[in-house]
Amino acid sequence: MYAAIRQGKAKAGQAEELARRIKEGAIPIISDVPGFMGYYVVYAPDDTVVAISLFNNFAAAEESNKRALAWIEQDLAPLLVGPATAMA
């Protein structure tokens, strides 16, 4: 099992909205990647939001980060303090 992890810092008070939009927008994009196994979104009191995707191979995890970061940059930038980061 392989994990793709993306993290972003929401603007003050926007973490719940950011998490909601991630669940609604990213899951359809990520779940379409072959090898997808699961998806989780968590947020911390400091407005950090972390999305974790699980895959059955490393290439799928990397592909999901590529797709997710493109979507985040296009659709979530107004809610973020700086760019999101990703690792697989």
Map each language-model feature to its residues:
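Short S/T/G/P-rich N-terminal loop/turn motif that feeds into the first structured element of a domain
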Residues: 1-50, 54-70, 77-88
